[in-house]
Amino acid sequence: MRVSILAVGRLRTGPEKSLIDDYLTRFDRTGRALGLGPARVVEVEDKKNAGMGAEAALLRKALPAGAVLCTLDERGKQLSSPDFADRMAGWRDTGRQDLALVIGGADGIDPSLRAEADFSISFGAMVWPHMLVRVMLAEQLYRAATILAGSPYHRV
């Protein structure tokens, strides 16, 4: 199952991008034998600053056809890392070819796009900068792959 992180805004070269690249490389390497990956980051940018509706339209264009649509939103469900791994395995095992994890812009995700989501995940009630959410999500993808592989990376 291919994984796409769809995000509003551009991430500049720096420590956050290095961390994301590292975790996604690890995910690809670990997930390959599990039917997970490759992972990619797709950035969309509303250059006209037309708001959440315009961002949602750009995100919809970037969605792979037939993908599981999972938003990252403070109103979403909080999952443990093993629960996230199980959810990913479940989507993979039902034959889904693509998973799209969507990170909104500064104002969040347009309500119409949130309503279309198959699932929504929250990293807690706090609001996080999009660059940190990308890092946290990339790490959780790698952690999920190691959990499914039985690797000792995730310790309880």
UniProtKB/Swiss-Prot annotation:
- Binding residues annotated for S-adenosyl-L-methionine, in chain numbering: 72, 104, 123-128
**Pfam families in UniProt:** SPOUT_MTase
Instruction: Give the UniProt entry's GO cellular component terms.
Output: cytoplasm
Molecular function GO terms recorded: rRNA (pseudouridine-N3-)-methyltransferase activity
Top enzyme class, one word, equals transferase
Question: Which Enzyme Commission number(s) are listed?
Answer: 2.1.1.177
Keywords, A to Z, come to: Cytoplasm, Methyltransferase, rRNA processing, S-adenosyl-L-methionine, Transferase
For this protein, the record's InterPro entries field holds: Alpha/beta_knot_MTases (IPR029028), RlmH-like (IPR003742), tRNA_m1G_MTases_N (IPR029026)
Give the reactions, separated by semicolons, that this protein catalyses.
pseudouridine(1915) in 23S rRNA + S-adenosyl-L-methionine = N(3)-methylpseudouridine(1915) in 23S rRNA + S-adenosyl-L-homocysteine + H(+)
Q: Where in the cell is it found?
A: Cytoplasm
NCBIfam families, per the entry: PRK00103.2-2 (NF000988), PRK00103.2-3 (NF000989)
- Quote the function comment for this protein: Specifically methylates the pseudouridine at position 1915 (m3Psi1915) in 23S rRNA.
Q: Which family does it belong to?
A: Belongs to the RNA methyltransferase RlmH family.
Subunit comment = Homodimer.
Can you say what this protein is called? Ribosomal RNA large subunit methyltransferase H
* Organism encoding this protein: Ruegeria pomeroyi (strain ATCC 700808 / DSM 15171 / DSS-3) (Silicibacter pomeroyi)
